[in-house]
Amino acid sequence: FTAGRHIGAMVSTEQEHWSLAGGVFGDSLTATNGAAHDQDEGWGLGARATFAPINEKTQVVHLGLGLNYRDTGGLGTTSFKQQPETHIGGINIADTGTISNVTDFYKVGAEVAIIMGPFSAQTEYIATSVSRNTATDLDFDGWYAQAGYFLTGESRNYKNGSFGSIKPKASVGEGGIGAWELAIRYSTLDLIDKDIDGGDVDSYTLGVNWFATPTLRFSANYVDVLNVNGGTYDNQEPSLFQVRSQWAF
């Protein structure tokens, strides 16, 4: 439901309490063959501004606003879909399918985040408006809210309008147990409007993150879809458990 990856150019600037970025983008990275590859996918604009009235080492208040505009060009179609809080499930529990006769669409997102020592919370809302040349325009939206707490006392790292990697107070291999975080998340997505029934989904996630070292992380998440209204998976309530290991260098 968020903006995908496209080839383009972007410029950005930042100071201690604010950041600003904007870019112009062309074709997507995913259309590598078939009809979509031979057609003009249009062009897009993207911009994001952030402001942190409080930006201390362990105390942060973050505000952000983003805008994404997309002209569909010769393709004239678009679609929106989402897996249930995972990238490996292979099932889009909310999916509009192909929306035809689309001239352009835009997305507006607002974000708020705070850090208070070992506690952090953030929320984001995204609204999408789709313009069609032979049918009524469409509106979709979604939002999430999440919170986390470090049992070992660390704080999330924040710089230039985004969160960075976690540095444990005492890493594994250096006499410590790393950084341990408990997390919770709630999200909702509504892809139903007019003649499009892509589904309305609500779900929550419980998670544990273990940062063994500054470059090694392990995560475990339990996701429960509370309900699906409409769409292909109407009235379904799936749940899943997923683990992840990550080495960054």
Kindly label every feature range from the protein language model.
Residues F1-A9, Q15, L63, L67-T72, ...:
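Outer-membrane beta-barrel translocator/channel fold
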Residues F1-K57, G64, L75-V102, Y106-K107, ...:
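Surface-exposed coil loops of outer-membrane beta-barrel proteins
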Residues H17, S28, N55, D71, ...:
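Short loop/turn segments at secondary-structure transitions that flank enzyme active sites
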Residues G23-G26, N68, I126, V223:
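Active-site-proximal beta-strand/loop segments in catalytic clefts of secreted hydrolases
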Residues V61-D71, A179-Y186:
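Extended hydrophobic secondary-structure segments that form protein cores and membrane-embedded regions
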Residues G76-F249:
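Outer-membrane beta-barrel pore domains
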